[in-house]
Regions:
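Short cytoplasmic-facing helical segments at TM-TM junctions of multi-pass membrane proteins
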Residues: 60-105
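Transmembrane alpha-helices
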Residues: 54, 87-120, 142, 146-158, ...
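Glycine-rich helix-loop "coupling/hinge" segments at transmembrane-helix boundaries
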Residues: 39, 68, 113-154, 170-177
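Hydrophobic/aromatic residues within the transmembrane alpha-helices of Major Facilitator Superfamily
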Residues: 28, 40-41, 53-57, 64-68, ...
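Generic hydrophobic transmembrane alpha-helix motif, especially the helices
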Residues: 22-56
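Transmembrane-helix boundary motif in ABC transporter permease subunits
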Residues: 1-22
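Alpha-helical transmembrane segments of multipass membrane proteins
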Residues: 2-7, 34-36, 40, 60-63, ...
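Short helix-capping/hinge motifs at transmembrane helix termini and TM-loop junctions
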Residues: 9-12, 41-43, 123-124
Length: 179
């Protein structure tokens, strides 16, 4: 998702193609999103993986593109005047400055993916999402809550890990901007 966001920030044509796709994926009900994948790939793990990826990568694309486009024009102009190539400008100036927003996009992608796992249980995944679905279907409060709490714990751990990684990367870029 972040790679597509970087491409979209660098090329307006890519952004124009991705924007309606992202808008559609973001506003489409989760159950409806499963239909085209089931029609093409039938029910199974691969179908669920594709549906989760399609739903979850939208924030990474949006946040990456927005973060890179939000880099102050003065900073870009100064780097260009100092002789930065387009590649150097992207990797040494824009990405380090957009990193907090890009990491927020990664965090949201992980959270969206975890939330989609319960819905993906409808197309044949196994795991905690399926246990939540089974608990719902059977009226087994204990199984559903245990699996739901497990998913919440995984989400909290993932959130803390991406936040710590973001801080670490920010420290790296601010302490040694030439790296």
């Amino acid at each position: 998702g972040s790679a597509l966001g970087i491409l979209a920030s660098e090329f307006k044509s890519v952004s124009r193609v991705l924007q309606p796709i992202n808008d559609t994926l973001q506003t489409m009900p989760l159950f409806v999103l499963l239909i085209p994948f089931v029609m093409i790939f039938k029910i199974g793990e691969f179908t669920a993986l594709l549906a989760v990826m399609a739903y979850a990568m939208v924030p990474a694309i949006r946040y990456s593109e927005h973060g890179l486009r939000s880099v102050p024009h003065e900073v870009v102009e100064a780097a260009t005047c100092m002789g930065c190539t387009r590649w150097q400008l992207l990797w040494r100036v824009k990405i380090p400055l957009a990193l907090p927003e890009m990491m927020l996009g990664l965090n949201q992608t992980i959270m969206f993916g975890i939330s989609m796992l319960v819905i993906a249980a409808l197309v044949g995944t196994s795991g905690l999402g399926q246990q939540v679905y089974i608990g719902l279907g059977d009226g087994d409060f204990g199984v559903g809550m245990t699996a739901g709490i497990g998913m919440a714990i995984i989400a909290i751990i993932a959130d803390r890990m991406t936040a710590a990684w973001s801080v670490k990367l920010q420290e790296r870029y601010t302490s040694n901007p030439a790296s």
